[in-house]
Amino acid sequence: MKKIRNFAIIAHIDHGKSTLSDRFIQLCGALSSREMVNQVLDSMDIERERGITIKAQSVRLNYKALDSQLYQLNLIDTPGHVDFSYEVSRSLAACEGALLVVDASQGVEAQTLANCYTAIEMNLTVVPVINKIDLASADPNRVLQEIEDIIGIDATDIVFCSAKTGLGISNIIERIVRDIPPPKGDPTAPLQALIIDSWFDNYFGLVSLVRIQNGTLRKGDKVTVMSTGQSYNVERLGFFTPKKIDQEELKCGEVGWLVCSIKNIFGVLVGDTFTLTYQPAQQALPGFKKVKPQVYAGFFPVNANDYQSLNDALGKLRLNDASLFYEIEQSNALGFGFRCGFLGLLHMEIIQERLEREYNLNLITTAPTVIYEVITHDKNTYFIDSPSKLPSIHEIKELREPIAKCTILVPHKYLGKVINLCIEKRGVQKDIFYHGKMVTLTYEIPMAEVVIDFFDRLKSISRGYASLDYEFQFFQTSNVVRVDVLINGDRIDALTIITHRVNALYRGRELVDRLQELIPRQQFDIAIQTAIGNNIIARSTVKQLRKNVLAKCYGGDVSRKKKLLQKQKQGKKRMKLIGKIELPQEAFMSILNVKKKSNKVC
């Protein structure tokens, strides 16, 4: 155990975490030069293309240090995006130390800050590293000062490196061996194995990535999942190099994988604990929680015949992603589809892209929404994840919206614009700290405001320098209303939105104008209305296409012309009763582009 080092890499998106992992694998000789590809641990194409890590991965490396001792290094690669923060916390719980990797040109960002504080709270040894020092725009001295001022850790013994060129990589590994402590644990105690991640394999079933905190796990053991009490036989176990290697046992302090022929990912959730059935531990390892979706959206197939294919595809994706939620939803406008729950907007985009790319599905996606808490006059409480499910305004006694705690890190010169944006988004300032040229803002902002366009606008007004970290805090009573969209008198449930009453008139008007631009003209007038309850708040008309029925009349009796015009009028009326209006996909996404009124709501 004294020769084991378990560590994670904390870094913001695109600060070079996966490239640094590649250099470690290369230096330790885990893969030959022929087998090496860029971003080895990012197994999905979408991870490589977007330059992000979505699923936690692990690799065991053997390294001969300068003291001539052979060390076992277990690197746990973690996601860097705010949507996957729970996976990060579970990965950190499996480690004794972490590398804090910061880009030499971009400096410290909010997600780095959040994950670093999580590591410090867990008593992990943090080794600061400044990456990308080969860039022309690199300013390592400024970034070193930021690490000390903003994060508050000693950076005098910092390591400078370039993961791209390989400069300084051996120095980092020597620091891991020197500074990160070996694992603590009792090999003779009852088994406690932390589940870091789990995914589905078509041949083996569910594969779980685990860290042995106490005891020893052997092939053939019977293990119990402590939160559910379900028991399984360990059929295979081993570790990654990153190739999958079988072995007979995992010892205390080691990280590896195990297969128990589990066919359902919900049998083994991230953060849970395995123990031996015949010699169970007294309690589970701390920190386990069931992840709840924060953002919901409707997925509907463009072709109704693809409904079963969409159902199968979501089922397969869910095998690898326990945080994905879906249930059948029927829409008057779009037919049968699914209401899906996600950790955040990036998570939603990734799932949609995988459905379209890997399963060749053409989808209509409704605008994302958050979950609301509704208390009715008969004292029942409901959690509403779709605007169309919201009860009538007369039935609601109290409506509460989710509030997110947002930590924003921004250069001082953009502070005014960022504060104005937070006020526009109905934010309440809780804290402000100045660190040299950087400022940390803490705001409580309604989650509905955060998930729509807050991140994009924050990046836009700060020229990409501001960064954001957010987490759900609590539900708060709010004066929000449901705005329905009616087209020719028919309520289109997929276009319904929930917004604050002060913004409702503005958003209703804006939505009507957007739809008027997007809906193609027909042979009859199309009336577009928005309503709160029974009150129409905005209306517009898409004018009909008109055929000139008098073109064949060259003079003659005026009654003949009147007769033709009357006949056309009756036909248009009949067409309006039975005519179907096809709404383009842009109509559903237009809700996202409706900007909100720039005023603070108390």
Curated annotation (Swiss-Prot):
This protein's UniProt keywords: Cell membrane, GTP-binding, Hydrolase, Membrane, Nucleotide-binding, Protein biosynthesis
EC number(s) from the headed UniProt entry: 3.6.5.n1
Membrane topology reported for the UniProt record: Peripheral membrane protein
Pfam families xref list: EFG_C (PF00679), GTP_EFTU (PF00009), GTP_EFTU_D2 (PF03144), LepA_C (PF06421)
Localization of this protein: Cell membrane
A single cellular component GO annotation: plasma membrane
Entry-linked InterPro entries: EF-4, EFG_III/V, EFG_V-like, EFTu-like_2, G_TR_CS, LepA_C_sf, LepA_CTD, LepA_IV
Catalytic activities: GTP + H2O = GDP + phosphate + H(+)
UniProt cross-references to SUPFAM superfamilies, sorted A to Z: EF-G C-terminal domain-like, P-loop containing nucleoside triphosphate hydrolases
Chain residues that bind GTP: D14, H15, G16, K17, S18, T19, N131, K132, I133, D134
GO terms (BP aspect): positive regulation of translation
TM region(s), chain numbering: none
Domain tr-type G: 2-184
EC top class, as a word: hydrolase
Keyword Iron attributed: no
One GO MF term attached to the UniProt entry: guanosine tetraphosphate binding
The family this protein is said to belong to: Belongs to the TRAFAC class translation factor GTPase superfamily. Classic translation factor GTPase family. LepA subfamily.
Function: Required for accurate and efficient protein synthesis under certain stress conditions. May act as a fidelity factor of the translation reaction, by catalyzing a one-codon backward translocation of tRNAs on improperly translocated ribosomes. Back-translocation proceeds from a post-translocation (POST) complex to a pre-translocation (PRE) complex, thus giving elongation factor G a second chance to translocate the tRNAs correctly. Binds to ribosomes in a GTP-dependent manner.
Name under which the protein is recorded: Elongation factor 4
Organism of origin: Baumannia cicadellinicola subsp. Homalodisca coagulata
Organism classification: Bacteria, Pseudomonadati, Pseudomonadota, Gammaproteobacteria, Candidatus Palibaumannia
